[in-house]
Protein backbone atom coordinates (compact mmCIF):
# COMPACT_ATOMS: atom_id res chain seq x y z
CA UNK A 1 0.00 0.00 0.00
CA UNK A 2 2.81 2.44 0.88
CA UNK A 3 4.25 2.24 -2.62
CA UNK A 4 0.89 3.11 -4.16
CA UNK A 5 0.41 6.09 -1.85
CA UNK A 6 3.88 7.42 -2.66
CA UNK A 7 3.30 6.97 -6.41
CA UNK A 8 -0.04 8.79 -6.37
CA UNK A 9 1.20 11.60 -4.14
CA UNK A 10 4.21 12.13 -6.41
CA UNK A 11 1.91 12.19 -9.46
CA UNK A 12 -0.07 14.87 -7.62
CA UNK A 13 3.12 16.92 -7.26
CA UNK A 14 3.50 16.47 -3.51
CA UNK A 15 6.93 16.35 -1.89
CA UNK A 16 7.12 12.78 -0.60
CA UNK A 17 10.15 11.14 1.02
CA UNK A 18 11.60 7.99 -0.51
CA UNK A 19 10.48 4.72 1.00
CA UNK A 20 12.99 2.99 3.24
CA UNK A 21 12.87 -0.60 2.03
CA UNK A 22 15.18 -1.89 4.79
CA UNK A 23 12.76 -0.74 7.49
CA UNK A 24 9.63 -1.63 5.51
CA UNK A 25 7.52 -4.05 7.58
CA UNK A 26 7.42 -7.55 6.11
CA UNK A 27 4.55 -9.92 6.88
CA UNK A 28 4.03 -13.54 5.91
CA UNK A 29 0.51 -14.80 6.59
CA UNK A 30 1.25 -18.43 7.27
CA UNK A 31 0.82 -20.72 10.25
CA UNK A 32 2.69 -19.55 12.22
CA UNK A 33 2.90 -15.98 10.98
CA UNK A 34 6.28 -14.35 10.33
CA UNK A 35 6.97 -10.63 10.53
CA UNK A 36 10.08 -8.50 10.47
CA UNK A 37 11.70 -5.24 9.52
CA UNK A 38 15.22 -3.92 9.43
CA UNK A 39 18.50 -5.76 9.48
CA UNK A 40 19.19 -9.38 10.34
CA UNK A 41 22.07 -10.20 12.69
CA UNK A 42 24.22 -11.19 9.72
CA UNK A 43 23.45 -7.97 7.81
CA UNK A 44 24.11 -5.79 10.86
CA UNK A 45 27.44 -7.52 11.56
CA UNK A 46 28.32 -7.13 7.88
CA UNK A 47 27.75 -3.39 8.23
CA UNK A 48 30.17 -3.26 11.16
CA UNK A 49 27.71 -2.96 14.03
CA UNK A 50 28.56 -4.36 17.44
CA UNK A 51 25.30 -5.99 18.48
CA UNK A 52 23.04 -6.64 21.41
CA UNK A 53 20.40 -9.25 20.61
CA UNK A 54 17.33 -9.86 22.72
CA UNK A 55 15.18 -12.95 22.29
CA UNK A 56 11.95 -13.86 24.01
CA UNK A 57 9.94 -17.05 23.41
CA UNK A 58 6.15 -16.89 23.42
CA UNK A 59 6.27 -19.83 25.88
CA UNK A 60 7.05 -17.19 28.51
CA UNK A 61 4.10 -14.97 27.55
CA UNK A 62 0.93 -15.32 29.62
CA UNK A 63 -1.46 -14.38 26.82
CA UNK A 64 0.12 -16.88 24.40
CA UNK A 65 -0.17 -19.58 27.05
CA UNK A 66 -3.82 -18.67 27.72
CA UNK A 67 -4.55 -18.85 23.98
CA UNK A 68 -2.77 -22.21 23.75
CA UNK A 69 -0.70 -20.86 20.85
CA UNK A 70 2.76 -20.30 22.30
CA UNK A 71 5.16 -21.47 19.59
CA UNK A 72 7.55 -18.83 18.29
CA UNK A 73 9.58 -15.91 19.50
CA UNK A 74 10.51 -12.24 19.20
CA UNK A 75 14.09 -11.25 18.35
CA UNK A 76 15.39 -7.69 18.53
CA UNK A 77 18.72 -6.71 16.99
CA UNK A 78 20.21 -3.50 18.34
CA UNK A 79 23.41 -1.49 18.22
CA UNK A 80 25.48 -2.21 21.33
CA UNK A 81 26.57 1.43 21.28
CA UNK A 82 23.42 3.24 22.34
CA UNK A 83 20.86 0.49 21.83
CA UNK A 84 19.36 1.75 18.56
CA UNK A 85 16.88 -0.81 17.24
CA UNK A 86 18.27 -2.16 13.94
CA UNK A 87 15.78 -4.94 13.26
CA UNK A 88 12.97 -6.99 14.74
CA UNK A 89 12.04 -10.52 13.67
CA UNK A 90 9.05 -12.49 14.97
CA UNK A 91 7.44 -15.83 14.39
CA UNK A 92 4.23 -16.89 16.08
CA UNK A 93 0.51 -16.29 16.38
CA UNK A 94 -0.63 -12.84 15.25
CA UNK A 95 2.91 -11.42 15.03
CA UNK A 96 1.98 -9.41 11.95
CA UNK A 97 -0.20 -7.33 14.30
CA UNK A 98 2.71 -6.73 16.68
CA UNK A 99 5.20 -5.25 14.23
CA UNK A 100 3.88 -1.67 14.25
CA UNK A 101 5.14 -0.88 17.75
CA UNK A 102 8.68 -2.01 17.04
CA UNK A 103 8.66 -0.38 13.60
CA UNK A 104 7.59 2.93 15.15
CA UNK A 105 10.46 2.66 17.63
CA UNK A 106 12.87 2.41 14.69
CA UNK A 107 11.21 5.30 12.83
CA UNK A 108 11.57 7.52 15.91
CA UNK A 109 15.19 6.40 16.35
CA UNK A 110 14.34 4.73 19.63
CA UNK A 111 16.43 2.30 21.62
CA UNK A 112 15.88 -1.06 23.26
CA UNK A 113 16.01 0.79 26.59
CA UNK A 114 13.07 2.99 25.54
CA UNK A 115 11.18 0.04 24.11
CA UNK A 116 11.74 -1.84 27.37
CA UNK A 117 10.16 1.01 29.36
CA UNK A 118 6.99 1.04 27.26
CA UNK A 119 4.00 -0.11 29.32
CA UNK A 120 1.90 -2.87 27.74
CA UNK A 121 -1.50 -4.27 28.65
CA UNK A 122 -1.22 -7.42 30.75
CA UNK A 123 -1.61 -10.06 29.64
CA UNK A 124 -0.94 -9.34 25.97
CA UNK A 125 1.12 -10.79 23.15
CA UNK A 126 2.80 -7.39 22.76
CA UNK A 127 4.53 -7.92 26.10
CA UNK A 128 6.87 -10.28 24.22
CA UNK A 129 8.35 -7.24 22.44
CA UNK A 130 9.03 -5.57 25.78
CA UNK A 131 10.58 -8.79 27.10
CA UNK A 132 12.85 -9.12 24.05
CA UNK A 133 13.94 -5.49 24.53
CA UNK A 134 14.60 -6.22 28.21
CA UNK A 135 16.57 -9.33 27.18
CA UNK A 136 18.74 -7.16 24.91
CA UNK A 137 19.48 -5.08 28.01
CA UNK A 138 20.11 -8.24 30.12
CA UNK A 139 17.00 -7.49 32.20
CA UNK A 140 14.34 -9.96 30.99
CA UNK A 141 11.65 -10.64 33.57
CA UNK A 142 10.01 -13.88 32.42
CA UNK A 143 13.07 -15.83 31.29
Give the predicted meaning of each segment:
Residues 1:
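Acidic, glycine-rich loop-and-beta core segments that form the ion-binding/anion-interacting portion
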Residues 12-13, 17, 24, 29-143:
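Flexible, glycine-rich terminal cap/loop adjacent to redox cofactors
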Amino acid sequence: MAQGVVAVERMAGLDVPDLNYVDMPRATYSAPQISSFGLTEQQAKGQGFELKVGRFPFRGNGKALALGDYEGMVKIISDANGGAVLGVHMIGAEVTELLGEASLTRLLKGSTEELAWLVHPHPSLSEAIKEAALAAEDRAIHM
